[in-house]
Each structure stands twice: as C-alpha cells, then as structure tokens.
Amino acid sequence: MLNDILSRVARVGAMHAGNRPNPPDDRPQPCRGKPPTSPGKTIKHKSFLGALAGAVAGALVAAAVAAAAVFLVGVTGGLAVAAVGALAVFAAGDLISAVTNKVSAMVDSASPAFGPVASGSGNVFVEKQPVARATKDTVACTKHNSPQLIAQGSESVFVNDAPAARIDDKTVCGATVKEGASTVFFGSGQGTYLDIADEFSWWEKALLIAVEFLVPPSRGMLKGLGKLFIRGPKAVLRGSRAGAKWIAGRLADKSSCASKAFKASSGLTRAKAAVKAFLKDPVYIASGEVIESRTDIELGQTLPLAFERTYRSASVHIGLLGRGWHDSWSEVATVTRDGLNTHVVITLAQGYDIDFTFHQDVQAVYCPHYPEFTLHRRGDGFSLWHRDQQTWRDFSVVQGERRLLSAIHDSHDNRIELVRDPKGYLRQVRHSDGVTLLLVWQGEFLHQIQRIDGGQKTLLAEYRQDEQGRLVEANATQAYHLYYDYDAAHRLTRWHDNDQTWARYEYDAQGRCVYTTCADGFLTARFDYLPDRVVMTDGLGQCSEFGFNDLFLMSWEKSPLGHVTRYEYDDYGNLLREISPAGRVVEFTYLDDTGRVSTFTDASGHQWQYDYDAAQRLCGVTDPLGREWGWMYDAEGNPERLTGPDASEVRFTWNRYGLLTQVSDAAGEVQARLQYDHRQRLLSATDAESRTRQLRYDGQDRVVQWQRADGARFRLGYRRASWTLPEQLIRPDDKEEQRQYDRHNNLLSYVDGNGALWRQTFGPFDLLTARTDAEGRTWHYAYDKESQQLTTVIAPDGSHWQWWLDADGRVIRERDMTGTETHYDYDEDGLCIRVRNGEGDTRHFLYDARGLLLRETAPDDTLHYRYDAVGRLTEVSSSTAHVQLEYDLRDRMVREWHNGTLLTRQVDDAARTVTRTLTWDGDADDTINALAPLTSLFHYTRTGELRQVQLPDGADLTLTHDAAGRESHRTGGSGFVQQREYDVMGWLTREMSGAQHDGHLLATQTREYRYDGAGNLTGVRHNRDAEGYRLDATGRVQEILSGGAGKPVDTTARFLYTRTGLPQEAGRLTEWQAGRLVQHDDTHYQYDRAGRLIRKQVVQPGYRPQVWQYRWDSRNQLRVVDTPNGERWLYRYDPFGRRVGKRCDQKAEEIRYLWDGDQIAEIRHYRHGQLIQRRHWVYNGWELVVQQRQHTGGDWETDFVTSSQNGTPQALFTPDGTLRWQAPKATLWGQRQAEKSESPDPGLAFAGQLRDSESGLCYNRFRYYDPAGGCYVSPDPIGIAGGESNYGYVSNPMCWVDPFGLAKCPTLAHGANGEILSAKATVSKAELRTGSGTNQSSRDYARSLGNQTDDAGHILGNVLGGQGGKGNVFPQLPAINRGQYRDFEKVVKDYIGQHGSVDIEWAFKYGNGGTRPTEIYYDVYQNGQKVFGRIFNN
C-alpha cells in the first residue's frame, strides 16, 4: 500500500488515493493497454542514464544509478521495508558507505534486468499470474533497498481499483516493466499515478540515495516520501537542469495554463489520479475506457529510446500503427489562435492531452496542475520540458496547425532525432548513443522498425493493419507477438497471443466497458457506472465500490469486506490526507506553485521537513529527530556532495554525458571509478581496492563478456538477433550452462554445468503451473482466479499445501502438507491481529498509528514494543525480559542492553574499525574472579572485508585477501597460519592449516575439495583420508565413498529419497508421514496438533524405553525438555526468539548466552550458582573463527578455528599453530559417531547450530534440528517460504546450510580465493519474512570480502527467510542491495506467497577478480522449471 501510495503521489500527487493498506503482494497491478505484468516479470531501468532497455552494461550502470536514485527518491519501497522492520534503512552501514555503495552498485549493474515485479492482485490473474497494479504493487528493483511502487499503469483498465500495470509502465524508481503477459493486453494509454524518479539524472540518484536516509520508517511516512521525492526533490532537480529562465518565468506563466483538460477525460492529471481506477484487465473505470499499452522497443544508454504504443477505446486518433493507437513518436502539438492568446494542446504517447495557453509575449507556460511539464516557445515550434525526466521534447516540424515531434534531448546534450521526409512521414530515429532505427511503411501505416547502425539490419518490431486501418497484429521481437480483434465501432473486443493468454471486453451503448474476462476465467469483472460511484463485481460475485471527486481523482474506495479508504486533495490534485479504514491518517503540505512536498506527517504525528534551493532542488531534509541531510550541486546541476547528520560526506564526479565516473569520500579517497565507451556503455568499474571488472558488448549493446578482476572471463550467448536475455553461459572453466525462454521471457528450462535439465510449465498470464526437477519430480500449482494468489501446492507424492482467502484476498486459513492448520484475522487496514495455531493457542497483535507492532499478547506472555520518532525499535519487554536499543546518527545499533548484559559498538569510520564490548552486570563488583568486559577490535579493508580482529587477551587474527578479494591467508597468535587456494571458477580447492616455521607452513590439517560441473562438492580429502560423494542430478548425495592413501575405496553409506526429497538411508528404517519423521530405526516421534515434537521414544529389545518429552510455548519456542534420566531442562528466550539461557535444577547447572545479532558472542556456565567457565566467540559470517575459553580464576586460552565448507568446526589450533582439537566423525546429517566431552569442543554442528546433549537436538536459532533424523522437529516458522517440506533440512548438507533454522541457505561453493562461487536454497511460504538482519560480525565478514563501503548483502534475502549471519552474506553495493536486489527478493517473496516453494540458485561472477562479486546470477525455479531470473551488477 505504501508503495502504491508513494507511486501515486509521485506521479500524480494525490491521485494515488486508492490503495488499500497492505494489499496482498501477489495482487496484479493494473495494466496500461499493454501486456499486463505480474510477479516475477522483469523490470529494467531505461537508458535514462545509460540504462539499456535490454541488458547492456552501460544501460545497467545507468539503470543501476538511475534505479538507486529512483530508489532514494521514491524511497517508497526501500523505506517501506525499513519501516516495517522498524530499523533504519542504513542501520547496517554509514551514510557515506551506503551512498557510495549504491552509486557503485548502480554503476556496476550490467545485467539486462533490475529485478522482478514483486507483487500483484490477490484475485485478478492473467495467464495464471497475479496482475500487478500501479500504486499498489511493487517491484524488487535491484537498485533499491526496498520495494518500489509501480507508478504507471493503464488509463482504462483497473485491477482491484488500481491501474493495471503493464509492459513499459514505470516504477517510482524509474525502472520500466519489461515483461508481461504474452497473450493478454490491458487498457491502452499510460497513466502516471506516482512520481517517477529520473533515470537519467545521476545527481538525482545521489539525492535519492540521500533521501533513503530521510525516508521515515513508517508506512505512512513511506507514502509521503513517494510524493515528496518523486514529485518534490526529483522535480526540483529536474527543474534545476531546466535552467534559471524557467524558474524566473514560472510564476508569471502558471496562470496561463488552461485547466479544462484537467476536468476532461483527456486530462493528464486526471489520468494520473485515476491510476487507482484501473481494474481487471485494462479497464479504466473512471470513464469505462479500455486502454492497452505496451512498449515494444527499449534502447539507449543515456536517453531512453523507447517505442511505446497505447490503444484507447474512446480515441478517434489515427497514429503510426492505426486507428485508436497512440505512440511515442506520434506525440504532437496542436496550435490554435484566439486573439492575442495561443492555445497549444500536447498529445502524449499515452493518448492524453495537456492544454497550455500563451498570452502575448509569454515565452513559457507553467501548469500548476502538471508541475512536471513546462511548455516553451521556440520560433514556430514548441519545446516541452519534463522536469521529472529532465528531458525536452521539441515540436518543430510544421504541418498546418500541428507541430510534429522532431527531437528529444536532455540537459547533457544526449539527443534523439526523429528524421522525417517532406510529407512528415517518420523515416529514421537516431540516438546520440549511436543507435539508428529505420522505419518501413506499408501504405499509411508503420510496418517495420529495423535497427541499422553498425551495418546490421535487425528487425525489432513488425505490425499489420486490416483494411479499416486497425492494428491486428504486433510482433515485438524483444517482447510479445499479439493479435487484436475489434467490433464495428472500432473498439477492442479481444486480444490474444496465440498461446494461452487472452482478454475479452464488452461495451454498453455509451462505449463503456461493462464486462471483461480473461483466459481460464482470470480477471473477470462486471462494471456498473452509477451517478455517484462505480461498482465492480468480480468473478466470485464480490463487489468493490469507488467514488471520484470533481477532478476525477479517487476520493474513496470500499473493499469487498466494506473497508473504506478516503483521500483528500487540494485544488491541484495534490494529496493532502489519506485516511485508512481504521482511521490512520498521513498528511502532506506543499510549496506554493511547485508541487514540492515541504512536510510530511505520519499517522503518529511525527514530521519530516524538506528544504529546496533557488533552483527548486532538494538541499536539505530534517527528520523528526532533528537530524539533517544536505546536498550541494555543481554548475551542471549534478549532485556534487552529500552531507549526513554526522558531517560525513560522499562526493560525486560526472562526465559530460551526465554519467557517474567517480565516488569518493571527504578525504578524497576514491571508492569507485567507472569508465564508459564511445557509446556510453559501461566498460569497467574499479573499487576502492583497485579491483577492476570489465564488460564487453555486441552490436546490439548486449553484454557478451564479463571479466573478473582476476582475469576470469564469462561469455554470454543469445538465441536470436533481437533477444535480450542470454541463453548461454560459457564459464571460465569452459563449462556451458543453458537457459531457454518463451516469448514471454519465462524460463522454460535450465541445463546446468553437469547437463542436468530442469523444466517449468506456465499457464495463462505466465503463471507457473508445474515445475520438474532434474530427477523428474514434479510440483503443481493452482491459483485463485480473482487474486491470482497461490492457493494450492501439490507435491510429487500427491500431498497438498493449501491456503484460503477472504474477500479482500488475504490468507485467513492455511493447511500444510501434514494437515496442521493455522488461522489468521486482520483489522480494517489489513494488519494481522490474530494468529491461531493447531493447538488453539491464539496470539493477538496491537499496532500503533504507523502500523508498527506495539503489543503481542499470548496465553503465556505479553510483549511490548517501543519505537522512536523515526520508527526505530528502541525497547522490547516481556514478563521475563527487557531489551533496550540505541543507535548512532547513521542508524547503526551501537548499544543493546538485555537483562543485565550489555553489548556496545564504537565505529571509527576513518580508521575503518569497530570496537565491540561485552559486559555483564555485577562483573565490576566481582573482585575475586576479575571479570573484566570483553573488548574486541575489528579492522576492515577499504572495500569492507574483515582484515583483522584484536582479541581481549591481546591475541589477534589477521586475514589477507588476494587480487580477487578472496581470503588467501589467516595468521594468528605467534604461529597459526591457514592458506587457501582456488580454481579458475573461484571455488576453494585447498585449505592448509598449521604452524609457521622459518616462513614456511607446516600443515597439520589439509583439506582438498573437488566439484562437479554444477559446482556441487563431490570429494573432500582430509590429510591422508578421502571421502567422495556420488550425487543425483539435483545434487543430493546418493553414496558416500571413503578411501585414501593406501586404502581401498568403500561405500560407507547409501541414500534414497522420498518423492518429496526427504532422506532415507539404505538399510535403515526411516518412515515419513506427510513430510514429518515418525520413525527412525528404533526411535519413534510423536507430535502435537500444532506440528511440534512432544515425545521421542527409543525402544530397543531387552531395554526399558527411553523417553524424551518436549514442551513448547505459544511462539513455538521449546521451553522444557524432560530426559530419560529424570533431568528437566528449562530454556529461556529474549523477545527476539534468541535463547539466552538454559538450566537444570537436578544438576544445579545453568548456561547463559550473550548475543551479537543472531550469533552467540559469549557463553557462561554456572554450577550451584557459581561461574565456572566462560567462552568468547568471534564469527566471520556464520563461520566461527576464534574461540576463547576461561575457567574461573584462570587465564584465557585462545583457539583459532577452522571449519568445513558447511560451517562445522573441524579443528582448533593454539596461537603457536599446534593442533589442539579436531572434530569427531559425523554422519552426512551431522550425527556424531562418537561423542566426546573435550573442553575445547565448541559444541557446534552445522552452521548456526548449537548441540544440546540433554535433548540430542541442535538449537538452530529459530528451530531445533535432529541430526539423527536429518530434520527439524517443529514446522518452519516461515511456512512454505522455507520450502515444500515443513520439516526437512537442506537437500545436501555438504553444500547447503540453514544457519537459522528457517530458509535453506546454500553451503557456499568458494573459489580459490575464498570468494563465493555459487549458492542454492529452497524457500517455502512458511519461511517468508522469517529472516534476520545482519550483525556487525557478518557485516565485517562481508566487507572483508569486498569494500569497506559495501553492504553485507543477504544471499537469500531477509524477506525470504535468509539470516544475517556470515553464512548468508556477501559484499554488495548498497544501491543494489537496498534497491534492485531487495526489490527482486520481494518479487520472489510475492511469487512464493502465491505459488509456493521455490528453489533458488545463485552464481557469483568476479569480473575484477578478488572475493568481491561483480555480477550475481539469481535464478528462481519451481518444480524443476525456472520461474524467472535476474542478473545483478555489483
């Protein structure tokens, strides 16, 4: 909702007044007369600043930068995420780092896509995919930290009261929807309902980045930001580029702008405000028009060169393509004279008209209704300035009263020329980036568009008209091949793609669409146009109502359940107030004449203030805490300097084309350098450690080669001349990977480096219907016809996971594959207020005006939450715990107090260090044991890699990285050394640990790794012992082979798997029921109605049964364990679900834990109330690297830890390099074959797992894992988001890990330098939103692999259940991490929410070598079929 509101605000000011609070992410967005888009569909940043429509690096960079800027400007999405989490967007990093990273990320972006559409309608589907809607749904733009609202949509088609989002529609961050349905088209005409960030303005991007810091963390705030940054700051920035003349004349000109268009159906403002009015296919309910809009071509590196076409059923216009069709190159100015006044009507590509009136001697007209447009006289022609896009449109070709479009250009002289013949026919389109298009005519209409620069003759689009001049076929080779049917009145009655998708329309006598339906019954609706409202009845008979004001802006909307949202506007259509159904109110004020937001007040009364300079550029922001951010600009209007509340600075350098070339800090230290070729395509990006990644392109500006800093090259191949998605990847090891897509850009199949084939099947509206893995297992998916939300997942064994929705499309009941049911209730605003589990335990939730959780009430406890003015969580309390949090000026958590323990952090940005101190109450008074606080100092490189840790006892651990940024050496104490080697793919091949003597390593532990073509681990040699793994096509272990020097090769274990992938070891009894383990050999398992293990019994002949009993609380936290020997262990947790203690009264023992984020930092062991031992742990990511032990009264003993590839500690070394302890052998699933109680043993299992000897389980942060059965003992807290199996661990524990017991995070395949090469994960619906944020340790680790300014980016996103530990992070540009990547994750989340579990695979490319990836390949599969994928530049 926030995203939608922001988008609407940005585009129209107040027109976005129709979004429902928290609309289902999977609801489709309204389409604009083009193929409707849906979750998972690709978005791209246009060549605004070089963002190639396809996947050119230059475009990527421009797109990335633009996206970042947009992201910041429209902070609509990113902030929303931050708000929801109650944490500042930049909580993980400083302002400078964040900004630098974002800019760098944008620059590094070389992928053809910037993320997917993240959400859609919950009840309207096209091609079985939820239809995305403008102003309501978001995209996961990899350039932003948060979801970005779709800002544009159909002008005539609305879905759930929101304009349908389609191909070519833009998001508030400036990205363009690139994919959509292949057979369905929604309402022509493109309405802009929210402000759109300038993709062309790099400096604006910087501003946007800054804005990110300003975005209030509340939902309401996010809404305001959308309006503010898109319409305000962005407009200001654009205005600055327009020049001082525009500023000087705006006051005199504004009064001359005609407002009649505003009230007429052709008014642009009306269209923007009506975005919300697009329902179902592309029906614009405000007028009843059907609007079909599509973008067939997108090219260009600087200025976006796009060909957009829009059909409007009520239009009599005849354009290049035929009757009723408008297009980008047919925009025209129509001039009429009335005495001394000159009236000019500008007709835009979306079919809208804007009226301007020039009085005598007036040279420029500014329209208060459309503050983004200013019209200037230019001799006999006119120039239209679009401040939001920072572009000029010249209308200088005279044809009677008409002035044809002749050029489009920006403030940096990037230019698109439209070359016409003497009769006015458009013959060529030439871009200053070097692109030339040839237009081929057939009679009076356009027949073909060909690209002819560089000697090529590539067909980009082909059209065919019937005898009556109506477009009947459109074949955009980069997008869709569509067919159109019309009635006798030339109104569109049907469109289809000759495949599975189609849409049909019926009209009344007034030409209004009264009925529409689509393939398979999706998006069916009937419209009744009443005098005071419009009533829409969907295919299930559910009614929604909408009211409009005199400006045709939605003034209220009523959901099927009767919830009413109201909107109030000023005379110019700016949104003043939005009142949710529950009465939550957000407010905006604006600067006179400019439409710039001056203040935003959230629902709790907290206010943000915005200041502008004389050029109307945003120059200052003040948040409710009084923190201030400021911007300074160069002579060209580019942002030159950004200053944060702590006086830190980020400086930017730009080239003559407006492209970012350098980012540096206040001291002049360069953080990133970017270089472009003569066509403004990004050629290379160099980070702060001088690691350079390089890109190469073909004649169509597609990336064909990416080179890491270490020289490794990845080559990309394309199936056909105009295809923009690479379908072939030749890796540095000469292995080939293949992908096959359909015309809708749906991934149909994927062949990995082993030749294993995964397949996917799609239905109407590109909804995934089946996924088959490489072993032939198939999952099927079913959807709700109205919301297109996933309602059923059918596993290969026939078991079902189902969801039931209410009339508003919200999940009210869920039943997993074991039959466990969960029920949900919501308030009027869509906030979940009750959850009831299978045992009948109910948890109640209360929220404040901002939608932030205030109280959680359960039968066994009540939690209270407090926040500061900007929405940061500051305090949480329960009956047994009290937590207080403090932040610095950059929103970094610097103090966490919990029941007597205190964790503090001191950050020195100049020195790139973080000092962590652990303190316990009472230690200062304990003079006997001298328990001093534990202080550790972490040092980082300029790119963020952990470089050194100085420990409390004076010892230190130093990490060294190679040219590719991979960890190559570790040295600690007086002699400990570890060396790592990598292959050409960057996968770790050898790791040697031991002592250093005379400059040489005397290794006592050597581990060598071998991989298959898909990057799966197939063998490990440990000293003289070797173990091999025979895998199936999906990478699961089938056999374990042992051997070694002088030893025969034996098969030590064989594994089979159920149809759903659960393990069954050959020769052993393993029984699963509906995905839950019920018997393993002699061990029997019993569960309660909530699906939690309550009894484990071991029955062996001749012995008494051994019984363990387990008791859980309402939050599914294990509280009590009764063991066979009569012991009872009690577990305690903090409000965040972290276990902070356990005790056994029978043994008089107690263990307490002090946490640093999601990792244990210190453990204290008490006996009879006396402290007997404590341990201090230091992590790098999820890998334990240092353990320190101290017995009461003794000295500290330091152990340097080496771990296996899955995070399991393998050995401990003394500071002099002597082997002190090595782990006993364990089974594939982690069960130790011989338990030893050696004191040095850290007691850790797989990454993130702490062994509990009393229960035989492993504490896994959010759940408990049973290594004997290889599964969890309670349902996944995040549901199907964690995978189709609610209890299963990972598919292959040698390659995958699950550090938090939530998502199935992959075990990372590392390269020779320690860089991450690949990762895999399975995410189910239950895992959604169960992830955790990064901690200082993981951030340090990520930066140790990359740059000091990098974010610790989640490989598997927080929203997907990914944890923030070292095992799930990598160095990532902030702009990408918080922008495109995060937006894409939301798309994935929405898809999972609708379609169920998915398998995710990542491949990391290192164009500059080192350990910092420059490109991330992110592919999502379902049932073996690739659902969608993206490539992220970094």
From Swiss-Prot:
Location relative to the cell: Membrane
GO cellular component terms given for this protein: membrane
TM spans (from-to): 48-68, 70-90
YD repeat positions: 486-521, 592-628, 847-876
Major localization listed first in the record, in broad terms: membrane
Cross-referenced Gene3D superfamilies: 2.60.200.60, 3.90.930.1, RHS repeat-associated core (2.180.10.10)
EC number(s) from the headed UniProt entry: 3.1.-.-
Membrane-related topology note: Multi-pass membrane protein
Cleavable signal peptide: none
Null allele phenotype: A double rhsA-rhsIA deletion is outcompeted by wild-type cells, restoration of rhsIA restores normal growth in competition experiments. Restoration of growth requires the RhsA-specific immunity protein, rhsIB does not restore growth.
Keyword annotations from UniProtKB, A to Z: Hydrolase, Membrane, Nuclease, Repeat, Toxin, Transmembrane, Transmembrane helix, Virulence
Keyword Cytoplasm: no
Region of interest (Disordered), ranges: 14-42
Any one Gene Ontology molecular-function term assigned to this protein's record: nuclease activity
InterPro entries, per the entry: DUF6531, Endonuclea_NS_2, PAAR_motif, Rhs_assc_core, RHS_repeat, T6SS_VgrG/RHS, YD
CDD domains according to UniProt: PAAR_RHS
Keyword Ribosomal protein: no
Function, in words: Toxic component of a toxin-immunity protein module, which functions as a cellular contact-dependent growth inhibition (CDI) system. This protein may be a nuclease that is specifically inhibited by its cognate immunity protein RhsAI. Upon expression of the C-terminus (residues 1284-1434) in E.coli growth is inhibited, cells elongate, nucleoids condense and plasmid DNA is degraded; these effects are blocked specifically by cognate immunity protein RshIA. Cell contact is necessary for growth inhibition.
Protein family (similarity comment): Belongs to the RHS/WapA nuclease family.
Protein's recorded name: Probable deoxyribonuclease RhsA
Annotated organism of origin: Dickeya dadantii (strain 3937)
